């Protein structure tokens, strides 16, 4: 029921933003470019065909660009970035061959302490996808360097909002340094495990040396504003998403939830203080 309700809200929101875009185009002659970053996890064997279909749709309605791409003056109206959190082996088997044979850029965010090991958290599994192993160092090195960008997903895939400052610092620095030593390049990108963060984490990541970090809050990351934001949202995509749900997601229908997450973060500290006073 919860999923259906969220779907209906997203459908309504998509209609609202479509009307808004139309009015801006008619009244002001304004037509904004939009960039949306997609966030995948596992690509199970039985969902490979669906994943390929999704990529074909993205290429029909827009352009798939690398995560280090910044939109400037262009006639293209929609851009998409493809990211994979966790680095499950299923992406090597079921996603990478198609991506690389079609010259599609993508990014993989690795929790470095689990390279070559079975993931302990497993918050996402496909139907025919048992506990998966994270790709190892050799598999990372074999990825096409012209298409694949490797980023940090912390060291141990912990929930940052539940650990102290010192541990946060270790997680951010260790994963960055391990990947930099392995690839002999700078690692400027971070994907936040579970997508949960606070302002202190954002500032810490900046101080550690990351140039861009990704949450799991759905939103357009670029809209002709000229900003190259440090903190960027992403829309969660599953290869088993129904086709209509996928279309609504990539057109921005689920972006309303980013406003909900921001409001929740603002309210949470206030409620915590009130409960402390009562105690």
Model regions and ranges:
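A short acidic, glycine-rich active-site loop
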Residues: 126-134
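Generic enzyme active-site microenvironment
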Residues: 83-84, 151
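Histidine-centered catalytic micro-motifs
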Residues: 38, 43, 149-158
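A short acidic, helix-capping loop that chelates divalent metal ions and anchors anionic groups
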Residues: 117-119, 158-163
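Acidic (Asp/Glu)-rich catalytic clusters
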Residues: 54-63, 97-104, 133-152, 206, ...
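Acidic/aromatic-lined carbohydrate-recognition and catalytic surfaces
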Residues: 84-89, 93, 102, 111, ...
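C-terminal active-site subregion of NodB/CE4 polysaccharide deacetylases
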Residues: 2-83, 89-94, 162-169, 173-189, ...
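A short, conserved beta-to-alpha structural element at the edge of catalytic cores
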Residues: 103-126
């Amino acid at each position: 029921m919860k999923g259906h309700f969220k779907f209906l809200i997203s459908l309504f929101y998509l209609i609202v933003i479509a009307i808004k875009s139309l009015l801006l185009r008619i009244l002001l002659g304004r037509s904004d470019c939009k960039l949306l970053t997609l966030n995948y996890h596992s690509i199970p064997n039985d969902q490979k065909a669906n994943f390929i279909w999704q990529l074909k749709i993205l290429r029909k309605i827009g352009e798939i660009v690398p995560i280090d791409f910044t939109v400037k003056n262009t006639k293209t109206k929609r851009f998409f970035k493809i990211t994979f959190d966790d680095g499950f082996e299923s992406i090597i088997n079921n996603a990478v061959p198609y991506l690389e044979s079609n010259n599609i850029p993508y990014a993989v965010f690795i929790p470095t302490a689990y390279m070559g090991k079975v993931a302990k958290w497993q918050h996402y599994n496909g139907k025919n996808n048992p506990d998966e192993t994270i790709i190892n160092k050799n598999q990372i090195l074999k990825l096409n360097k012209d298409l694949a960008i490797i980023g940090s997903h912390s060291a141990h895939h912990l929930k940052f909002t539940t650990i102290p400052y010192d541990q946060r610092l270790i997680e951010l620095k260790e994963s960055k340094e391990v990947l930099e030593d392995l690839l002999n390049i700078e690692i400027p990108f971070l994907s936040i495990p579970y997508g949960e963060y606070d302002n202190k984490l954002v500032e810490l990541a900046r101080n550690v040396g990351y140039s861009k970090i990704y949450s799991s809050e759905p939103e357009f990351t670029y809209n002709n504003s000229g900003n190259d934001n440090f903190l960027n949202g992403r829309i969660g995509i599953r290869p088993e998403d129904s086709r209509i749900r996928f279309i609504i997601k990539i057109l921005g229908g689920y972006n309303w939830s980013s406003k909900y997450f921001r409001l929740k973060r603002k309210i949470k500290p206030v409620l915590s203080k009130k409960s402390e006073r009562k105690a």
